[in-house]
């Protein structure tokens, strides 16, 4: 059996793809894979922040098209890059074991959010990260920083930026236990991560039941439950990358969910916790609370 796998061609994308394929191989040892590399709009446009490009699903549409056109059997993505609604005819069908979902502050000097010097230049092109940073440290300068993980790390190492905010998952997958920069975790209450961060997923045609069944066997159950809650939250808030909203679910050893969600704007932030058993209901409740907060912010302005 051979499965054609569409993915972006960056080093991190290929590492993430291999991670998910290893889970499939563990349940179906005889399966073979053919990698189909796809260039996306997000890969090609590097001189603008993502929210300024104005294309939804900037890292996923072209990759998923390879599946719809029959050029690949499945597409592999970082779940955080997928919009709440997939292209008709496609479904989410496989979930990797989750890497740490939180963001981190990287620097040469081992800075924390508290010890960053006044006026320090901090890089990120994420509206979410920028707004939460401004709420916590209004005295630092937030500047756009695009590029793959190596590029962003390199700009910190070269001194172009004093620090940058990035995903822990990408750094861990790329550098393992030997990163070239200091890494300080940011609590999810400080900077709530985007829904799906740390999870790698497969997207397939909804009629390919044989592949859906295989991916279900290979999926990490904890990641699938957390992803379900976070996707319900994402659908509920209905906001793209131009709004500073984050949300992350954590499955407890007792089997219940703890959901942390946040919104930031105008130098202020609001974070809420929701607890429950049903992933969809927990995600919807968190979205409802954040929607209420956004409305209050609008009324205040």
Curated annotation (Swiss-Prot):
GO BP annotations of the record are: protoporphyrinogen IX biosynthetic process
- Describe which pathway this protein belongs to, using the record's wording: Porphyrin-containing compound metabolism; protoporphyrin-IX biosynthesis; coproporphyrinogen-III from 5-aminolevulinate: step 2/4
Q: Which domain of life is it from?
A: Archaea
Obligatory cofactor(s): dipyrromethane
A Pfam family this chain is assigned to: Porphobil_deamC
Q: Which UniProt keywords apply?
A: Porphyrin biosynthesis, Transferase
Tell me what else is known.
Answer: The porphobilinogen subunits are added to the dipyrromethane group.
Classification via PANTHER family = PORPHOBILINOGEN DEAMINASE
Entry protein name: Probable porphobilinogen deaminase
- What is the native source organism of this protein? Pyrobaculum islandicum (strain DSM 4184 / JCM 9189 / GEO3)
